[in-house]
């Protein structure tokens, strides 16, 4: 069935077939015309030969009748000779016309074949177009296969850009946190607190350590617990021997006994950095101008905030030796600060 199936006819196929058949038919017609004219010329030549023979015979008869003295035979022979001569002249004219026709035909054949070369070029152009069309379906799948990886790489580049943007945002957020932490660390106004506040501001735990002074007790207790949970896995191995024995009992006693918090502060201070020291000094100075409830609330926030600061020795090993010798000095300064807090706390109660 596939062998008998005809190809789909397109204008290019039709043009190729018509141009091919036109050249073939033209060449065939020219050859046939030349053959026919040659046959006609040969036929006329035969007829002329026969007419000449008859004329020769008629002339011999006329001579014989003239010798015999037969007048009727002479007249009949003369009529036949005249007819044959007319026919012979006609044949000669036709032969001349046929020869002229053959000469013109040959000239026309040459001209038409020259013109038909343009038709042959059209046929060749149509054939090339059909061949290129047959070659295109073979190249298209290869071109599509080559285009798909290019599309994938183009699609991968936009996918890489959103991945780069989230990476840039976390880098920008710590910078914003440090900018927010530095103004909170500056009001301490102590030379010893500033060098310790800047390294502490670089980590994510510095923000909860600086902000609890301006917020209620519940918020500072919730934020450090959430943020130190991410910082503890890296900081626990180094911070356990220093921070846990001192900071955690102090935090527990601060949560259990609000009245005993000024006494629990010196226990939490030796493990904390100068950041915690300056933060503890600030609540000690503020209760003179605020009600009695706020001094009791702020010290409750500080030991809890000291826990993120206590985990920092894991990230800054060089600060540990500086922090441990200053523990007795911190204890003495905190002890001197707590009587001041007690006296300041007693003044508002008497005023109330």
Curated annotation (Swiss-Prot):
Disulfide bonds: none annotated. Coiled coil: none annotated. Residues 138-341 have a biased composition (Low complexity). The keyword Transcription applies. Residues 128-352 are annotated as: Disordered. The C-terminal domain binds to DNA. It is unknown whether binding is specific or non-specific. This is Transcriptional regulatory protein AlgP. The gene is algP.
């Amino acid at each position: 069935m596939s062998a008998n199936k005809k190809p789909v006819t397109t204008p290019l196929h039709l043009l190729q077939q018509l141009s091919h058949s036109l050249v073939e038919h033209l060449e065939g017609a020219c050859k046939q015309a030349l053959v026919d004219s040659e046959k006609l010329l040969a036929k006329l030549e035969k007829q002329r030969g026969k007419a000449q023979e008859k004329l020769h015979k008629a002339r011999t008869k006329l001579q014989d009748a003239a010798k015999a003295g037969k007048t009727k035979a002479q007249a009949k022979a003369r009529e036949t000779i005249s007819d044959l001569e007319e026919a012979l002249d006609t044949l000669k004219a036709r032969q001349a016309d046929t020869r002229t026709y053959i000469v013109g035909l040959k000239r026309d054949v040459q001209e038409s074949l020259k013109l038909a070369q343009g038709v042959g070029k059209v046929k060749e152009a149509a054939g090339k177009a059909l061949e290129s069309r047959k070659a295109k379906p073979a190249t298209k799948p290869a071109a599509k296969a080559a285009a798909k990886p290019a599309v994938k790489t183009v699609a991968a580049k936009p996918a890489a850009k959103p991945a780069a943007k989230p990476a840039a945002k976390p880098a920008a957020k710590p910078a914003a946190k440090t900018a927010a932490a530095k103004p909170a660390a500056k009001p301490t106004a102590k030379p010893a607190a500033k060098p310790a506040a800047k390294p502490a501001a670089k980590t994510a735990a510095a923000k909860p350590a600086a902000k609890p002074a301006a917020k209620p007790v519940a918020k500072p207790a919730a934020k450090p617990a959430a943020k130190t949970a991410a910082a503890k896995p890296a900081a626990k191995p180094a911070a356990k021997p220093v921070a846990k024995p001192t900071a955690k009992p102090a935090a527990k006693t601060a949560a259990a006994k609000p009245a005993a918090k000024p006494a629990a502060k010196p226990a939490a201070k030796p493990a904390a950095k100068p950041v915690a020291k300056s933060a503890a000094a600030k609540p000690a100075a503020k209760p003179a101008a605020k009600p009695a409830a706020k001094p009791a609330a702020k010290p409750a926030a500080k030991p809890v905030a000291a826990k993120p600061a206590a985990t920092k020795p894991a990230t800054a090993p060089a600060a540990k030796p500086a922090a441990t010798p200053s523990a007795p000095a911190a204890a003495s300064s905190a002890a001197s600060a707590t009587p001041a807090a007690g006296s300041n706390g007693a003044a508002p109660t008497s005023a109330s």
